[in-house]
């Protein structure tokens, strides 16, 4: 529909001859997948987003969120909330775990719709390009935690803070509620994870629960790069 076409037009068309940008993003793939994400956002999870006015309309920023739900669905929902933001739509990038390219088809698919390997160099380049970048500092510690540990924040990596200070970049804190219930893991089968070369092998109920989701975008936070006073 016309609204979806408007969303697609928000994405920068800075792709090369073969239709891909430097990180593997492909505008055609977005056109093919955005309708499904719209369904997840509006109908399946019935997402309510708050604080959208806090997202800068332009310029670099880091979207720092909690992570849960086994699959990167929460990242897709955050991205759609930003893309459909009535206060000023933005097409963000999202940092993903380094093991995703080892999963057949998944890595290329995620790259094609705006996901980028979670490497500091990639993030630096995107911030230099004035991108809005979604980061989950908990990583797999958050997304693959057991259901009994739901809503318990896991340790945050601090790489995003160093980048925010080094590149004078505002941090937009984000809380996602509801995805803990979407896919429920009851155990991590470590021998299997080691065998297949993945960080985790969750024992899950093979069903995605249509849990109601809420996304809260906080006000921008700025941190001064004061390395001279570090001890």
Predicted regions and their residues:
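Non-catalytic C-terminal accessory region of glycerolipid acyltransferases
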Residues: 1-29, 125-231
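Membrane-anchoring hydrophobic helices of lipid-metabolizing enzymes
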Residues: 1-82, 86-114, 118-121
